[in-house]
Amino acid sequence: MNRLLIVASTSYAGMGPYVSGIVNTFLPNDDVYYFFHDYDDLFFRKNVKEELHSRSTFYKLANSIWNKLYDLIFGHWVYEKDILDLCHEKRIELIHFINGCGSCSFNRKLESMGIKVLGTVHDLYPHEVKKAPHKMLRHRVSVRRLQAAIWECHNLLTNSKSQYVELQKLFPDKNLFYHEFPSLVSKDVK
């Protein structure tokens, strides 16, 4: 198995339980490292099992209007250099963007360093949303960037059988993977 870095860029809208549910299946001796974008609630720090913390980077970034504006204008994460440094330090061979695909420019940079990139397709066709105009603008820009990254990324994974079939039609030359959706039913829900 390649030395793997799993990057989780958000814990919102069910993504936190999705990511922590997957990550918590790994063992500390697995050749896997983790980079979590944590917000003020520290979701990942609280929900990723303690024994994986030594292999984890928890990057706390406030969910502020300024950080959202930065992302909207520049189209990349402020912590990309931190991820690159981690890849170099840990000799990462494969990076899995578990919440999406990373930006096109960042993926190209990683691939130029010999690091394979695996993106996750959650919504091939994004849901319609009704929000305030400034939030709609941010949503549309984010969706366009994500769709561009999906088209450019050579390796894609999805948890949806129907999306997997659609991806096979759209991208017959890409490496496509299907993995069953992990259960979000926790012991608290039971």
Task: Set out the residue ranges of the language-model regions.
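An aromatic- and histidine-rich active-site surface loop
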Residues: H76-K81, I95-I115, V121, Y125-P126
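Extreme N-terminal starter segment of soluble prokaryotic enzymes
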Residues: M1-L5
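A short, histidine- and acid-enriched strand-loop-helix "catalytic/donor-clamping" loop
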Residues: C101-C104, G119-M136, H154-N155, V185
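Donor nucleotide-sugar binding/catalytic pocket of nucleotide-sugar-dependent glycosyltransferases
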Residues: W151-K190
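A short, glycine/small-residue-rich beta-strand->loop->alpha-helix junction that serves as a flexible
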Residues: I6-G21, F97-G100
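N-terminal strand-loop element at the rim of the active site
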Residues: A8-A13, N24-F74, Q163
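Membrane-proximal helix-turn-helix segments that form the acceptor-binding/catalytic region
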Residues: K81-D85, S105, K109-S112, Y125, ...
